[in-house]
Amino acid sequence: MRPRKAWMLVLLLALVQLLAVASAGAPDEDSTDKEDAIEEDEEEDEDDDDDDDDLEVKEENGVLILNDANFDNFVADKDTVLLEFYAPWCGHCKQFAPEYEKIAATLKENDPPIPVAKIDATSESALASRFDVSGYPTIKILKKGQEVDYEGSRTQEEIVAKVKEVSQPNWTPPPEVTLVLTKDNFDEVVNDADIILVEFYAPWCGHCKKLAPEYEKAAKELSKSSPPIPLAKVDAIAETDLAKRFDVSSYPTLKIFRKGKAFSYNGPREKYGIVDYMMEQSGPPSKQILALKQVQEFLKDGDDVIIIGVFKSESDPAYQLYQDAANSLREDYKFHHTFSTEIAKFLKVSLGKLVVMQPEKFQSKYEPKSYVMDIKDSTEAAAITEHVVKHTLPLVGHRKAADAKRYTRRPLVVVYYSVDFSFDYRAATQFWRNKVLEVAKDFPEYTFAVADEEDFATELKDLGLSESGEEVNAAILDEGGRRFAMEPDDFDADALRDFVTAFKKGKLKPVIKSQPVPKNNKGPVKVVVGKTFDSIVMDPKKDVLIEFYAPWCGHCKQLEPVYTSLGKKYKGHKNLVIAKMDATANDVTSDRYKVEGFPTIYFAPSGDKKKPIKFEDGNRDLEHLSKFIEEHATKLSRTKEEL
């Protein structure tokens, strides 16, 4: 028994030894947890270090460097901060750098010190966008986080003085110069002003917010003019009656008022553009002619229509009516007036008459030398403008890029060649123009013009005539936006007459700029090209939503996935087509679908393709586009209630 017990004891001791070894080799749970915690703490410390790196504000020659990451944290507790937005490649920024460093050194000695910082606007795009930076360098002052524009010169003395002024504890922003108009004061202010610019805006409108600082800067500048030109604004959402009264349907809408009479504002929308435009608009719309010699020079050497009002004096009621009419057309034509009886005699008219005539180079035996209108006390300004517009074009005019909008009446017959009315080339120019006159006299319902081939090189290319090899080419532009090119051949009056006659009889095929027709067009969004616009968009049996886009347009790229989802959503509706067209590479063959920006979206309802509905909602998401379709669709297979 003893040997057996001894053997059992040995085995037991061996087992205990093995357990002890195993226990020593295995990791302790508490120990493992502690190690994991240490590792996590180290990682958190590393993250904190990274955050600290992001928030760290570096300094270069005394100027602090701010970026998208550290900006808000840095300015949060600062009373006043001077900022410069710059571009590394900007020459003006490089020239300004030493001056800015001197400014930083000076303001550092201020009590308390005022931080001076710079921001690379090309790399810190979020900040540049936030502060509407559009030029370099742009200087801003922050006062308790609020932006203060700096409009002075880029000198140490002027900038330091302005920053110190803003840093004073009792400094407050100056009141807005822009007047605020409501229904209570609108008529009083507007009726009393010789000229005033009024902006109708919506508080939520992005374009209005972008315009606001430029508008206020312009208001400040124009308030210093002599006499001052006031600028005002109307909240069109709160003042709905005023907005309706002046046909405000989009924002911002700007209108010029002269003693209460409204005129369209067609000028720029930035400070200097607004200032220059309003300064020009504040002058008289018509210039006085004192000497007969001036009229004679207009006739002999002029190259534009001559518009002259003949009146007794400035107190003549007809004169004021003429001024009102001239104001509405002052951007398109040059107006003149005279109180000279000698000039009236030369023009063969009595006082109170409006005379519209062409310089000698544009006169012909087929048309009157002048068109005269009698302006009475009962005459309306609209009748005067109608008379001017109706008679400003000669039988065959000179169409130029600068006045192309005068030639909006269609059909328009254009003859292209080297048009030059200078002394040396006038005879050659008139040689071809006279041939056009022979045809134009027989088609009074059409507008005829000659145009210089170099000025309209792009138009000739689109017509397929840029490489025709002919000295003279011709085309017809019709009211539907279509273009017809005359086959290149020897040009004469008979050839042009045959071309115009063929057009009148509907025997010509239009020239259409078009990408190739897609071979496979079965995707959720149909691709439309110039050659398929009529067959797809103008299909009378189908509702069509058409997007006009440009390949380079950022908004179009953002819209693309949403528009594709829209196509998928309605793919099962056979009588509804979701389509898109590159409007830069294809002709829109109907003038009812005007494309003035990208993207432009229209709904073309079945059976009424000449009245497309434009998508005006700023929210181009799936929900709003779907709602737009369902509001106007005539061919959805399900009812709107079900949708």
Curated annotation (Swiss-Prot):
Instruction: List GO molecular-function terms, semicolon-separated.
Output: protein disulfide isomerase activity
What is the residue range of the motif CXXC? Answer: 90-93, 553-556
Organism of derivation: Bos taurus
Keywords in alphabetical order: Acetylation, Disulfide bond, Endoplasmic reticulum, Isomerase, Redox-active center, Repeat, Signal
Q: Which residues form the Thioredoxin domain?
A: 21-168, 170-300, 503-634
* Subcellular localization(s) per the UniProt record: Endoplasmic reticulum lumen; Melanosome
Name a single GO cellular component.
melanosome
Query: What family is it from?
Result: Belongs to the protein disulfide isomerase family.
Any idea of its EC number?
Answer: 5.3.4.1
SUPFAM superfamilies reported for this sequence: Thioredoxin-like (SSF52833)
The positions making up the signal sequence are 1-20
Catalysed reactions, as listed in the record: Catalyzes the rearrangement of -S-S- bonds in proteins
Q: Which residues in this protein are found as N6-acetyllysine?
A: 365
Q: What class of enzyme is it?
A: isomerase
For whether the record's keyword set contains Nuclease, the answer is no
**Record-level GO BP terms:** protein folding; response to endoplasmic reticulum stress
Record-annotated disulphide pairs: 90-93, 205-208, 553-556
A Pfam family it matches: Thioredoxin_6
Motif Prevents secretion from ER, per the record, lies over 640-643
The name of this protein is Protein disulfide-isomerase A4
Summarize subunit and interaction data from the UniProt record for this chain.
Part of a large chaperone multiprotein complex comprising DNAJB11, HSP90B1, HSPA5, HYOU, PDIA2, PDIA4, PDIA6, PPIB, SDF2L1, UGGT1 and very small amounts of ERP29, but not, or at very low levels, CALR nor CANX. Component of a complex containing at least CRELD2, MANF, MATN3 and PDIA4.
State where composition is biased (Acidic residues).
27-54
